[in-house]
Amino acid sequence: MKNLENLEKDLKNDLKKDLKKEKPILVSFLVSGDPNIEATLKFMNALDEYCGVIELGIPFSDPIADGSTIQEANVRSLSNGYKIHQSFDVLREFRKFSDTPVVLMTYYNPIYKRGIENFVIQAKEAGANGLIIVDLPLDEAEQYRAICKKHDMGTVFLVAPNTPDERLMYSDEASTLFLYVISTFGITGARGSFEKMTFEFIARAKNLCDKNKLYVGFGISNGEHAEKIIENGADGVIVGSAFVDIIKEYGDSNETIYKLKELARELSEGIHKGYVKYNEKNKY
């Protein structure tokens, strides 16, 4: 019987094969500077082997789209004196060892204060592949999109179950990395299960959006969730609060590293199972 180390190696090899074949992936989300910036780098390195994309949140004092778990992580980071340049610094360090795509997630205010083009240039130089600005409406993003295009910075826009078809296709066209599909109404945070509406929305988005991969986020916290989302046609799952909960409980410790990797492994296995089921249902 294979030991745990060999099982981990097999899973990592399978993940690399999945990425090459464009199979569904795991996108992990972390809040930069929680509990400290040095720990953020360690957590990114720990999750890197399981993730196709890492989403790094830039702390903000009023994160309106986030639930209590991520709001509290923002508070912890800002209370420790977090500054935006630290996210760029940690990304530069991460780039010394990894080429895994990293997307910075933030709100418009911090970018506006820094200057949109200045922020994009600094993010690009640090090694970011794309940006998600949660509260920037697509209709008001023309300047931002032009600047990102000028500096070859990817853009990701969000869509929700109540997004009209025309808006859905417009968001797909405006996104250049992937489309962030919100699973349900409300804010981020773990949930017990998903409603039929979620799967109907994934099907609608898959039918209408032909440019980008569809990565589904909000409420996914375990392997069973990941399996169900992928089984219903998503190209990836975005998981944040479940990872942040671990960091809150165990802080900057080896136990945190172990728990993060354990959850990432469970999610990856769920993604693989969901992909097998999806192919079985759609092979004819």
UniProtKB/Swiss-Prot annotation:
GO terms for molecular function: tryptophan synthase activity. The active site is at 55 (proton acceptor), 66 (proton acceptor). Its EC number is 4.2.1.20. One of its GO terms (cellular component) is cytosol. It catalyses: (1S,2R)-1-C-(indol-3-yl)glycerol 3-phosphate + L-serine = D-glyceraldehyde 3-phosphate + L-tryptophan + H2O. Keywords: Amino-acid biosynthesis, Aromatic amino acid biosynthesis, Lyase, Tryptophan biosynthesis. It is an enzyme of class 4 (lyase). Pathway: Amino-acid biosynthesis; L-tryptophan biosynthesis; L-tryptophan from chorismate: step 5/5. The keyword Lyase applies. Tetramer of two alpha and two beta chains. NCBIfam families: trpA (TIGR00262). The alpha subunit is responsible for the aldol cleavage of indoleglycerol phosphate to indole and glyceraldehyde 3-phosphate. Belongs to the TrpA family. This is Tryptophan synthase alpha chain. The lineage of its organism: Archaea, Methanobacteriati, Methanobacteriota, Methanomada group, Methanococci. The gene is trpA.
